[in-house]
């Protein structure tokens, strides 16, 4: 009889928490754990009920146009293949353009009776590595996907652009060193900042002044197509310190 009552009392008696859950009053998600939850451990994970606050589209730092996100790995591969096909088409088109120009120059030389050596100009080598051209195209696309470039092409049409006055996209097909190309891209993007939208009130952004930067290309006949553009800052001669008043004051004191 006593064993029967002991069994009933043990069934209704609350079980003590397991050895692995002693002293743990909260679950892994921070919520209070129930008293009858004996199997819960810190390794239990529950999916978050709140969805990730991640936008469906993103823009480049200076762009107002939404760019579709890459949904999966297949989309990234397809986009890369499309870029390669476009690069191959651009290379073929540029080669045809060079051949047409060369044929036109030969026709003009033959009609005028001049020799080839008289009109021999140094032409730069053509970049034929698809990987290099693809990398350059990505850098150009990044610079063109900005508000400043959109404002520039609207304000200055192609037929009104002048050399050494308006920014010109570097030629991705010419043979440049990596350092020279990166410098040209950087200076091109700096020049595009002239068409940035006006800064809003309270913003820390400073307007880009054309007087602060002068872009020049230092090149020689030997490295005509491998020269590195340099950045030269203007120095106003009017701000030079005048020593003449100091000499006059020294003579008066002596």
Curated annotation (Swiss-Prot):
Keywords: Cytoplasm, mRNA processing, Nucleus, Phosphoprotein, RNA-binding. Belongs to the SLBP family. This is Histone RNA hairpin-binding protein. Interacts with mif4gd. Widely expressed. The modification Phosphothreonine is found at residue 60. It comes from Xenopus laevis (African clawed frog). A motif (Nuclear localization signal NLS1) lies at residues 24-27. It is found in: Nucleus; Cytoplasm. Residues 1-14, 26-38, 62-72, 116-126 have a biased composition (Basic and acidic residues). Pfam families: SLBP_RNA_bind (PF15247).
């Amino acid at each position: 009889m006593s064993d029967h009552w002991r069994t009933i009392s043990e069934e209704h008696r609350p079980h003590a928490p397991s050895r692995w859950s002693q002293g743990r009053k909260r679950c892994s998600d921070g919520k209070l754990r129930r008293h009858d939850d004996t199997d819960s451990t810190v390794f239990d994970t529950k999916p978050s009920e709140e969805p990730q606050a991640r936008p469906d589209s993103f823009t480049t730092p200076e762009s107002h146009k939404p760019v579709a996100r890459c949904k999966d790995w297949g989309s990234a591969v397809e986009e890369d293949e499309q870029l390669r096909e476009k690069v191959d088409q651009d290379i073929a088109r540029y080669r045809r353009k060079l051949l047409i120009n060369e044929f036109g120059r030969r026709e003009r030389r033959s009609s005028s009776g001049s020799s080839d050596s008289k009109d021999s100009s140094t032409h730069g080598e053509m970049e034929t590595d698809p990987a290099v051209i693809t990398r350059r195209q990505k850098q150009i696309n990044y610079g063109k996907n900005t508000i400043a470039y959109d404002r520039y092409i609207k304000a200055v049409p192609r037929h009104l652009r002048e050399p050494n006055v308006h920014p010109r996209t570097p030629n991705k097909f010419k043979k440049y060193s990596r350092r020279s190309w990166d410098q040209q891209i950087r200076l091109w993007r700096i020049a595009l900042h002239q068409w940035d939208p006006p800064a809003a009130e309270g913003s820390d952004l400073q307007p880009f002044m054309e007087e602060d930067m002068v872009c020049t290309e230092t090149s020689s006949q030997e490295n005509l197509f491998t020269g590195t553009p340099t950045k030269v800052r203007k120095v106003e001669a009017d701000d030079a310190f005048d020593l003449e008043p100091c000499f006059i004051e020294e003579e008066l004191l002596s």
